[in-house]
Amino acid sequence: MADQLKMRRRSNADVPEVALPSGYRLRHYVQGDEGVWADIINRAGALGEYTEEKVVDTLTGQPRFHPEGLLFVTTDADEPVATACAWLGTHDDWRAGSVHMVAVVPEHQGKRLSYWVCAAVLHVFRD
């Protein structure tokens, strides 16, 4: 995909601690979240159309996927509104990888949620 943004980061030592705005919190993927993830991606637009089956085929069923690396920002009412994934360099290497499939639903955009969920993904690689 030639139109994707690619950046390199030499170290994650200076990644800020995650400080979500009031009313939001962070959680990891749990088994069965494929529909939740697809809903966020579909509502955000521009990343394609996903079904639960496509999520399994392209994300959660892949060797580079690890459940601890798929993060969601939720409202305090447990509504998932943003996501990003720590996509491993290889199936067991946390030292390298990429921030994958970042999305925020339109109603919650403009609150820096993508910044904080990306920071959380970088913490996954660091920790």
Regions found by a protein language model. Give the residues of each.
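Acyl-donor-binding surface of acyltransferase catalytic domains
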Residues: M1-S22, V30
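Catalytic cores of nucleotide-enabled group-transfer and carboxylate-activating enzymes in metabolic
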Residues: L5-K6, E34, A38, T75, ...
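Active-site donor-binding loop signature of nucleotide-sugar glycosyltransferases
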Residues: R9, H28-Q31, T75, A86-L88
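Short loop segments at secondary-structure junctions
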Residues: R10-D14, T75-D78, E107
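Short, solvent-exposed beta-strand edge segments and adjacent coil->beta transition regions
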Residues: P21-Y24, V99
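A short beta-loop-alpha structural element at the N-terminal edge
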Residues: R25-W37
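A conserved beta-strand-loop-helix scaffold within acyl/acetyltransferase catalytic domains
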Residues: N42-V104
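Conserved acetyl-CoA-binding loop-helix of GNAT-fold acetyltransferases
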Residues: M101-V104, G110-D127
